[in-house]
Amino acid sequence: MMSPTPEDDRDLVVVRGRLRMMDSGTETDREQRHPRTTWRSICCGCTIGMVFTIFVLVAAVLLGSLFTVSYMAMESGTCPDEWIGLGYSCMRVAGKNATDLEALDTCARHNSKLIDFANAKVLVEAIAPFGVPNAAYGEVFRLRDSKTTCIRPTMGGPVSADCPVTCTVICQRPRPLSTMSSIIRDARVYLHLERRDYYEVYASVLSNAMSK
């Protein structure tokens, strides 16, 4: 004889799963870790914000310098060996007993040009106070400005003289830029804000102004 089945048993649903017991200590640890995580997130956000702000400021300064800063006002670099630095130019005696064409070719090999009158005047006046004997002033050197008029250095300063067939060659070129000035100049040239030969022309103008 079968036992009767209660009506409530037919409505039962089988439920399978795991029962996990959690003590109150776990909830306490989770509450303690939450403020630490929040504080770390705030610190990380502040650090990223500071780094981004510094980057933006540096970029703004560099971009502003491309348009406003005159790199000619910065400290210039040093002249190469065997070159004399004077003002915004570097000069050197590149040869002797050279004709006009030989003088031009000699300076071209040194990536330079013949000295002009303004720089020749500054050079002679700079070495005159050292009391070099007149014998050292016997050389006549050519000028870029004229093919017929040369310069003869004297204790009293430069004196114009007729150019002989051959004479001394003195070359000049702009003084090298410092590292920072070179970066600014290259950036301006790359952005087509300035011509590549602008510095050479500007240095020549400043040298002429200094000699007056």
Swiss-Prot record:
Which segments sit on the Intravirion face? 1-47
Pfam families in the cross-refs? UL45
Please report which protein family the annotation says this sequence is part of.
Answer: Belongs to the herpesviridae HHV-1 UL45 family.
Source taxon at top rank: Viruses
Keywords, alphabetical: Glycoprotein, Membrane, Signal-anchor, Transmembrane, Transmembrane helix, Viral envelope protein, Virion
What is the protein name given in its UniProt record? Envelope protein UL45 homolog
Q: Whose protein is this, by species?
A: Meleagrid herpesvirus 1 (strain H2)
Task: Point out the signal peptide segment.
Answer: none
What residues are glycosylation sites in this protein?
N97
Task: Provide the membrane-side ranges marked Virion surface in the record.
Answer: 69-212
* Cell location: Virion membrane
Give the record's membrane topology: Single-pass type II membrane protein
Span-the-membrane segments of this chain are 48-68
What InterPro entries does the entry give? Answer: CTDL_fold
